[in-house]
């Protein structure tokens, strides 16, 4: 089916920063996508094109990316008359039009907006939900697998003020079958956590971080984990909920010294207390022995490959690569060869097209890895990732706290999909890491 119109505009994400929205019009109507944005980004991610004009939006404007869609991509793609159902051909054309290795000419935010909208147009032409179209593109088998939800209920690092080192502390309901019940459990723990945080640290401690989690001014991971365990108990869900963490350690890695500064938000940090990677690895193991931690994301810096491989040898939980792998097949291949981690955090805007994101997931699955589909800290009302996680059959999604409408939009889409599928789905449960292999 021919594309009759492509139009991009600048809209706003959840942090109030500009981002790219793309409309594609075909005979089935208008199909819209909005591109998310990250705060703690890997240096190897595809290029997010920003204007750089500090007098407007602090340099974060996207008028160049919008113009690239309207003035370059739109006329070229319409003229090419590609079938919207042929996602790989469309994405290959977009990459060829850009002509750079990292999408620096047109911008990954321009290209991805078009790629996402194309996928929605294709699903509409086929008369199927987006998750079913994604499943067709990925070649995944049925039934669909429902997921291990990672809800970021406590924010630190670059996503919040205060001195808390680690960026995300997540809860993951893992014992019940119904998606609706797992979302309910997460919401109940979150409400208890807010109440406990305010009681312990004062009313302002219940304020939100970028991703909807509470952001109290606490100092250590142990404080954060104790709060979460207490909230789980107060909600009556002890034993039913696990914990995951995103350390985002690239944010506090000191490259010159090859050490990790656990007090990186303090300008007067004591260098004598900085840790080597074996020392940091022991800290993680100690935390995992004390708390029900099942997954750790970015435990080491993105280029500290030796540290990752060292940790992988002894780790008995999921080790997730985000900044390390940036949803890029080349980095995923290296991580597989070096035995650096055993799971991929899949962020479509890190690589810039739907096709490349699907291929990254397939590479990870092929190595026996888990795949966790993820939002970004600068999110929007677009719910595409909810359909992607179902279509890929990955069994894991990270879309964070049950607060703020841009986060809840994904949970609400998950509920709709669950209702639509009825009993035609499986629950990953404690087998979330290998959900792709689950069959009736």
From Swiss-Prot:
SUPFAM superfamilies: Enolase C-terminal domain-like, Enolase N-terminal domain-like. It is an enzyme of class 4 (lyase). Its main location: cytoplasm. Its EC number is 4.2.1.11. The active site is at 211 (proton donor), 347 (proton acceptor). Mg(2+) binds at residues 246, 297, 322. The keyword Cytoplasm applies. Its cofactor is Mg(2+). Substrate binds at residues 159, 168, 297, 322, 374-377, 398. GO terms for cellular component: phosphopyruvate hydratase complex. Pathway: Carbohydrate degradation; glycolysis; pyruvate from D-glyceraldehyde 3-phosphate: step 4/5. PANTHER family: ENOLASE (PTHR11902:SF1). NCBIfam families: eno (TIGR01060). Belongs to the enolase family. This is Enolase. It comes from Cochliobolus lunatus (Filamentous fungus). The lineage of its organism: Eukaryota, Fungi, Dikarya, Ascomycota, Pezizomycotina.
